[in-house]
Amino acid sequence: MELKKQILRDSYAVKITATEGDKVLGWGFLYVIYNDRHPEPYGLIENVYVEQEYRSQGLGTKILKDALQEAKDRGCYKVLMQSRHGKTEVHNFYQKIGFKDHGVNFRLDLIDSKPKQRD
């Protein structure tokens, strides 16, 4: 048996950043991913973050809806999101947007890496 690797150049990432002047208020990432299971790509939204002082003002909703529109524009047939256990407020926010709890994620850390921003 032989394993072959192929770099898929049609998969890519989009960073959505909310700013006010030079100040970054929040961001999110949309990854558009192609595979052989479906003819259309799927989207993966990760690391949606809003600075503490700008939360509860609709900014997270705007970032998320912009990412969802980008996924639609790119022809994604579904969008996935991930979140850690115990983040009830975040989970409620995602459900309010229309996401549903679906399955289980598994993770294996390959290196010890800490996020740049706080929760």
Residue spans of the language-model regions?
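A conserved beta-turn-beta hairpin within the catalytic core of GNAT-like acetyltransferases
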Residues: N35-I45, D101-H102
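Conserved acetyl-CoA-binding loop-helix of GNAT-fold acetyltransferases
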Residues: V50, S56-Q69, K96
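Conserved GNAT acetyl-CoA-binding A-motif
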Residues: A71-S83
